[in-house]
Amino acid sequence: MTSLSPLLEKFRAHLEDEKGSSPHTVRNYLIDLVDFERYLVERMKLSLLSGTHAAIRGYLGTLSTDHAPASRARRLASIKSFYKYLVRQKLLPASPAKLVKSPKLPKTLPKVLPVEEVFAILDMPDVKTVLGLRDRAILELLYGGGLRISELCGLDLLDIDRSGRIVRVMGKGSKERLVPVNAQSIRALEAYLARRGELLATIRKDQAPEAMFLNFRGGRLTPRSIARHLDTYVLKCALTRKVSPHAMRHSFATHLLGGGADIRSIQELLGHSSLSTTQRYTQVTWEQLQQVYDSAHPRA
């Protein structure tokens, strides 16, 4: 990323130090804002402090041909957050972005896997190897605990109470929550931990990381690596659909709801701050019910 202007440097410090935003979130905000600032300076001859409602709308208009509505909405959300910060810092009397309307987004439902497809993926890792044991434990926690991939990568050895079957995760905004997991997840984790030391063979004992999940060099596993391994297992299963780590989380929530769990409990398990975010899963199960009805009822 190019060097940041002083205002964006201050905003980055605010995101990191005060809001506790993840590195991924901070990076996305800054990418959006650097692009917006470039537009203001080069096209409008304005600065971030002199940006106007019309300039923001004009910027979004330049994105309309080659950016999806969701991408434009994210750019606007970054701009709104930035100007809200400037107002709170008394650098501006009001936000020029406040009345800019977000692009209309098509209603999309979470991508959910049938139970049998989830189980097929879980059975793919070769549990005769330490990396296979690691991947099996990762997949079990993604589905058995509904963890975000960033939460899973951030797990340390002390974050799991194996006897109590509890995982302590650091969610969005540095919000900590406790997540119960099933016995199979714990068994998979214990099998991996019994051989985890093999991944530390090239590392001095005093340099051993606290990370739960390690790569073959002994470092903390990254979200990109996990997504790549999942792609491999999906191909081995001969599934035709694309499966992301987040699809395992969606499947966790939808299968819980289908099994009778109440929406408030699922909200807590997922770490959603808003119930409306969790309520998307009720629409998924309703559509599934409609499909069952249409295929099974003699009058359908």
UniProtKB/Swiss-Prot annotation:
Instruction: Give the main location.
Output: cytoplasm
GO MF entry, a single one: DNA binding
Q: Which residues form the Tyr recombinase domain?
A: 108-294
Q: Name the domain of life this protein comes from.
A: Bacteria
The cellular location(s) given in this protein's UniProt record come to: Cytoplasm
Q: Which parts of the sequence belong to the Core-binding (CB) domain?
A: 2-87
Q: Which InterPro entries match?
A: CB, DNA_brk_join_enz, Integrase-like_cat_sf, Integrase_catalytic, Integrase_recombinase_N, Integrase_SAM-like_N, Tyrosine_recombinase_XerC/XerD, Tyrosine_recombinase_XerCD
Catalytic positions are 148, 172, 246, 249, 272, 281
User: What Gene Ontology terms for biological process does this UniProt record contain?
Assistant: cell division; chromosome segregation; DNA transposition
**GO terms for CC?**
cytoplasm
Question: Pfam family of this protein, just one?
Answer: Phage_integrase
For whether the record's keyword set contains Cytoplasm, the answer is yes
Keywords assigned by UniProt, alphabetized: Cell cycle, Cell division, Chromosome partition, Cytoplasm, DNA integration, DNA recombination, DNA-binding
This protein's assembly is summarised as: Forms a cyclic heterotetrameric complex composed of two molecules of XerC and two molecules of XerD.
Annotated function: Site-specific tyrosine recombinase, which acts by catalyzing the cutting and rejoining of the recombining DNA molecules. The XerC-XerD complex is essential to convert dimers of the bacterial chromosome into monomers to permit their segregation at cell division. It also contributes to the segregational stability of plasmids.
Record family assignment: Belongs to the 'phage' integrase family. XerC subfamily.
**Which NCBIfam families does the UniProt entry name for this protein?**
PRK00283.1
This chain belongs to the protein called Tyrosine recombinase XerC
- Native organism: Myxococcus xanthus (strain DK1622)
Question: Lineage, please?
Answer: Bacteria, Pseudomonadati, Myxococcota, Myxococcia, Myxococcales
